[in-house]
From Swiss-Prot:
Disulfide bonds: none annotated. It comes from Bacillus cereus (strain ATCC 14579 / DSM 31 / CCUG 7414 / JCM 2152 / NBRC 15305 / NCIMB 9373 / NCTC 2599 / NRRL B-3711). The keyword Transit peptide does not apply. InterPro entries: Flavodoxin_fold (IPR003680), Flavoprotein-like_sf (IPR029039), FMN-dep_NADH:Q_OxRdtase_AzoR1 (IPR050104), NADH:quinone_OxRdtase_FMN_depd (IPR023048). Its EC number is 1.6.5.-, 1.7.1.17. It comes from the Bacteria. This is FMN-dependent NADH:quinone oxidoreductase 1. Belongs to the azoreductase type 1 family. Keywords: Flavoprotein, FMN, NAD, Oxidoreductase. It catalyses: 2 a quinone + NADH + H(+) = 2 a 1,4-benzosemiquinone + NAD(+); N,N-dimethyl-1,4-phenylenediamine + anthranilate + 2 NAD(+) = 2-(4-dimethylaminophenyl)diazenylbenzoate + 2 NADH + 2 H(+). Binds 1 FMN per subunit.
Length: 208
């Protein structure tokens, strides 16, 4: 039985947030098409994950060197391990998030920091870093109210670009990406943009 991990990084309701609507649409469509799949859903805002910083980094290093950890470090490392192992065990992963102020919401950065561990999602080699989880099937769902498709705006998009860059570093070079954009910039076409985007979400979910 396939294990599927759904990761949502938006605490706004679907009535107000397009990426939340994309997430709900994908999950419901996928569940209907795959009733026997083992599914785990992570709401990153609800989890209130501790920032990835000195305690977790020091704990991870000390463990790798066989050194004794403080109680605080043990707790931080255990939290990282919990979410890292969950990700490693998943056959398929879906990320859903908005673009806020040119990048992803902070909880997603924290979560990705948990997953970016040498020897687990990538390794160092004489020829440079090498991804270790390229066999996973991944979908990226992103929403942004402005239109970033132009040559001028594209470099300012650091949400989907950020996530797909990290995935590529881990060896996942071909994630399927669905983006809904411009629904705030073009209010006269907003409903059409969202509806057409959600249809694309359904198509991807049905065959995922």
């Amino acid at each position: 039985m396939s294990k599927v991990l759904f990761v949502k990084a938006n605490d706004r309701p679907a009535e107000q947030a397009v990426s939340s609507k994309m997430y709900e649409t994908f999950v419901s469509t996928y569940k209907e098409a795959n009733p026997n799949t083992e599914i785990t859903e992570l709401d990153l805002f609800a989890l209130d994950l501790p920032y990835y910083g000195n305690i977790a980094i020091s704990g991870g290093y000390k463990r790798s060197q066989g050194m004794e950890l403080t109680a605080e470090e043990e707790k931080a490392v255990a939290t990282v391990d919990q979410y890292l192992n969950q990700f490693l065990e998943a056959d398929k992963v879906v990320f859903a998030f908005p673009l806020w102020n040119f990048t992803v919401p902070a909880p997603l950065i924290t979560y990705i920091s948990y997953l970016s561990q040498a020897g687990k999602t990538f390794k160092y080699t004489a020829n440079g870093p090498e991804g270790l989880v390229g066999g996973k099937k991944v979908v990226v769902l992103g929403a942004r109210g402005s239109d970033y498709s132009s040559e001028q705006m594209a470099p300012m998009e650091m949400a989907v670009n950020y996530v797909t860059t990290v995935l590529g570093f881990w060896g996942i070079t071909n994630p399927e990406t669905v983006v809904i954009e411009g629904h705030n910039q073009y209010p006269d076409r907003s409903q059409q943009i969202v509806e057409e985007g959600l249809e694309n979400v359904k198509k991807v979910a049905a065959k995922f």
